[in-house]
């Protein structure tokens, strides 16, 4: 039975976002721009999931993350071809997998009407990230955001 999200769940800034993390994700520090943070370990590798409201468009952020993994940037059409539609509450967004040699980033980006976006990102060991894709997608779908840029 799925746990019901609580306004005071550890790992969340309750004024900004709430959701239901998988039971094996442990709350991490919620500071500064991080409105939610969770961590998990498997086979000696760490994964971190963060939820951050910020500016910048989808392509610029995806290419910044690709650069962190030492990958070449995508153009707009490549981004369209490699992203999937995703929904969290009443927000529509894009889901993308950025596989690096040893690390992978899973990300969901939800633009808001006021010009900003919510960025939900998992980063960690590629093998473990692959195993966490379904849990990450379920977490993303469970999220409910407070308006941050209106």
Residue locations for each model-derived region?
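Signature of long, low-cysteine stretches enriched in small and polar/charged residues
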Residues: 27, 33-35, 63-113
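Surface-exposed amphipathic alpha-helical segments
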Residues: 16-25, 68-69, 115-150
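N-terminal "mature-domain start" segment
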Residues: 1-35, 76-77, 144, 150
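A mature extracytoplasmic/lumenal domain signature
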Residues: 21-23, 31, 42, 53-55, ...
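Solvent-exposed, acidic/flexible segments
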Residues: 14, 18, 31, 54-58, ...
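Coil-to-beta-strand transition motifs
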Residues: 44-46, 102, 113-117
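Secretory pathway targeting signatures of secreted, lumenal, and periplasmic proteins
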Residues: 15-68
């Amino acid at each position: 039975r799925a746990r019901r999200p609580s306004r005071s769940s550890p790992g969340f800034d309750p004024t900004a976002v709430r959701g239901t993390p998988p039971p094996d994700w442990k709350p991490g520090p919620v500071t500064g721009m991080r409105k939610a943070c969770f961590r998990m370990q498997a086979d000696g590798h760490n994964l971190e999931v963060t939820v951050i409201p910020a500016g910048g468009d989808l392509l610029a952020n995806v290419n910044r993350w690709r650069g962190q993994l030492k990958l070449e940037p995508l153009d707009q059409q490549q981004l369209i071809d490699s992203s999937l539609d995703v929904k969290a509450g009443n927000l529509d967004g894009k889901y993308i997998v950025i596989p690096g040699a040893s690390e992978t980033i899973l990300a969901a980006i939800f633009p808001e009407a006021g010009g900003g976006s919510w960025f939900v990102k998992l980063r960690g060991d590629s093998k473990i990230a692959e195993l966490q894709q379904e849990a990450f997608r379920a977490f993303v779908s469970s999220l409910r955001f407070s308006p941050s840029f209106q």
